[in-house]
Amino acid sequence: MAQKLKLEMVTPAAQVLSEEVDEIAAPGSLGQFGVLPGHTPLLTTLQVGEFSYRKGSDVYYLAVNWGYVEVAEDRVLVLVETAETQDHIDLARAKAALGRAEARLRELTPADKEYHNMQAALQRAMVRIQVAGRGGRG
C-alpha cells in the first residue's frame, strides 16, 4: 500500500492540481467523505462545496462546483466544473454574488424557473466566502 495519494483535479479550462497528498476530504452528493491511501475503489459525484487535501501538517482548501471523483488504487481523479484555491477567490466579488442571490431569491418562489439556479448561485457564493476566509493553510 502506498503512503501517498496522487491527486489530480481537472476543470474544462485547465488542470488545477497534480500533487502527492496524504488525504483528501470532498463534498460528495451524499455527504462529506474522506480518502486515505489504500481506499477502496470508488466513483461518485460531488456537489458544490469545500474540497481539502493534506500534505504533511498543511491543509489546503478549494471551492469546487459539481463534478465527479474517481478513486482507483492510490490515485484520486477529480473532474469538476470549477475549482478555486483560497488565493484565487475575490472575497468582495463573492460577497457581492451572495448579496445578489439573496436579493433575487426574496423575489422568487420555488415554482419560478430561476429559483433553483439562484439557490445554486447562493450556495456557490457561500462556499467561496468560506474557503476564502480560511486565511491561508489550515
Swiss-Prot record:
Q: Which Pfam families match?
A: ATP-synt_DE (PF00401), ATP-synt_DE_N (PF02823)
Could you state a single Gene Ontology molecular function term? Answer: ATP binding
Q: Looking at the record's lineage, which domain of life comes first?
A: Bacteria
- Recorded topology in the membrane: Peripheral membrane protein
User: GO cellular component terms?
Assistant: plasma membrane; proton-transporting ATP synthase complex
Name its cellular compartments.
Cell inner membrane
Q: Which UniProt keywords apply?
A: ATP synthesis, Cell inner membrane, Cell membrane, CF(1), Hydrogen ion transport, Ion transport, Membrane, Transport
**CDD domains for this protein:** F1-ATPase_delta (cd12152)
Could you tell me what this protein does? Produces ATP from ADP in the presence of a proton gradient across the membrane.
What NCBIfam families does this protein map onto? ATP_synt_epsi, PRK13446.1
Query: What PANTHER family does its record include?
Result: ATP SYNTHASE DELTA/EPSILON CHAIN, ATP SYNTHASE EPSILON CHAIN, CHLOROPLASTIC
Similarity comment? Belongs to the ATPase epsilon chain family.
- Subunit (UniProt): F-type ATPases have 2 components, CF(1) - the catalytic core - and CF(0) - the membrane proton channel. CF(1) has five subunits: alpha(3), beta(3), gamma(1), delta(1), epsilon(1). CF(0) has three main subunits: a, b and c.
Official protein name in the record: ATP synthase epsilon chain 2
Q: Which gene encodes it?
A: atpC2
